[in-house]
């Protein structure tokens, strides 16, 4: 693999499939991805455009805080992660299930 492919797969970790993401995908053409913690909006936009051959309109990125959990009276927490909402230009779509 060349370095550009490694960078793309380093930025996009996986698509997030949930009820909310499915609803956003159907209604407003928005796709949700888990991305690396140091990825910027520009990195995410370039990675999605190159990997799926689509045009991206808007990218919104947010950090999800890890949940506090306890097990047998011992405290701990899950790791936090970063999520990106990617809106495509009208008329374009991604088949997330078969592409990644």
From Swiss-Prot:
GO terms for cellular component: ribonucleoprotein complex; ribosome. Signal peptide: none annotated. The keyword rRNA-binding applies. GO terms for biological process: translation. NCBIfam families: PRK05738.1-3, PRK05738.2-4. One of the early assembly proteins it binds 23S rRNA. One of the proteins that surrounds the polypeptide exit tunnel on the outside of the ribosome. Forms the main docking site for trigger factor binding to the ribosome. HAMAP family: Ribosomal_uL23_B. This is Large ribosomal subunit protein uL23. The gene is rplW.
């Amino acid at each position: 693999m060349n370095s550009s492919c490694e960078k793309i797969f380093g930025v996009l970790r996986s698509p997030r499939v949930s009820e909310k993401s499915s609803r956003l995908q159907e209604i407003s053409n928005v796709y949700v991805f888990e991305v690396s913690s140091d990825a910027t909006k520009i990195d995410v936009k370039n990675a999605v455009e190159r990997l799926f051959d689509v045009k991206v309109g808007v990218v919104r990125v947010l950090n999800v805080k890890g949940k506090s959990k306890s097990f047998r009276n011992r405290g701990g927490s899950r790791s936090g992660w970063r999520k990106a909402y990617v809106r495509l230009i009208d008329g374009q779509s991604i088949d997330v299930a078969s592409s990644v």
